[in-house]
């Protein structure tokens, strides 16, 4: 069956993931002394980071592709029966938009945390992103347990949530020298799930609206 434009746009989630992964892997080359095992990914995009220019080039497709992907996914799931599932995806979309706009407006002013206004706002954006991420993934997992047609979404959401928890808990447990390792579990969870949503849309297509079957006359 021929793929629709909406389905094809779902592949932008994969493009977004690859753009972000390229930045995480190659941006440290422009940051002398950067220790990926100990430092956060956000240090690479700090306002005064030497790697900022390269980071911006490598992530040129990241934000725009991620928000377009999750937006067309919201369009593509309109016909699904499970309202709970749709709410979960809408919350995830809200998280992606918050992340795309918030982190662009308020990057860290310095590597680590310098305490400036934009650093405080960066933390506020992070808190909103974390809460929306967890809420959306939990709702999608619950909806998949109730509606088996959403099971594959639930499995992907469970993997993403597990990665987030590993990152969040790991950052509290592991020594500072390993902070960057566990932190990367968290940062790749959301963009990975976004890619999964886009692939679902591309492979499964748009859900058709469910219409009530007219009752037959006696």
Stretch-by-stretch model annotation:
Residues 61-87, 135-145, 209:
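Internal transmembrane alpha-helix with an interfacial aromatic "cap," most often the third helix
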Residues 17-36:
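Alpha-helical transmembrane segments of multi-pass membrane proteins
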Residues 99-139:
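Membrane-proximal helix-loop-helix units in multi-pass membrane proteins
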Residues 6-14, 80-94, 150-157:
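Interfacial segments of alpha-helical transmembrane regions
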Residues 89-104, 158-167:
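Small-polar-interrupted transmembrane alpha-helices in polytopic inner-membrane proteins
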Residues 44-64:
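Interfacial helix-start motif at the membrane-water boundary
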Residues 140-218:
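Terminal transmembrane helical module of multi-pass membrane proteins
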């Amino acid at each position: 069956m021929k793929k629709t434009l909406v389905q094809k746009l779902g592949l932008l989630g994969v493009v977004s993931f690859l753009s972000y992964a390229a930045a995480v892997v190659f941006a440290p080359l422009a940051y002398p002394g950067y220790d990926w095992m100990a430092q956060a990914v956000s240090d690479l995009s700090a306002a005064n980071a030497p790697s900022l220019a390269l980071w911006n080039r490598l992530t040129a497709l990241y934000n725009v592709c991620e928000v377009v992907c999750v937006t067309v996914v919201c369009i593509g799931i309109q016909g699904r029966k499970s309202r709970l599932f749709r709410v979960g995806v809408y919350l995830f979309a809200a998280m992606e938009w918050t992340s795309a706009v918030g982190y662009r407006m308020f990057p860290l002013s310095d590597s680590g945390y310098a305490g400036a206004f934009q650093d405080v706002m960066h933390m506020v954006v992070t808190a909103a992103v974390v809460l929306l991420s967890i809420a959306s993934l939990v709702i999608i997992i619950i909806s998949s347990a109730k509606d088996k047609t959403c099971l594959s979404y639930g499995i992907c959401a469970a993997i993403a949530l597990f990665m987030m928890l590993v990152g969040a808990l790991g950052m509290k447990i592991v020594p500072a020298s390993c902070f960057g390792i566990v932190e990367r579990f968290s940062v790749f969870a959301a963009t990975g799930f976004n890619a999964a949503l886009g692939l679902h849309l591309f492979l499964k297509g748009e859900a058709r609206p469910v219409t009530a079957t007219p009752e037959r006359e006696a």
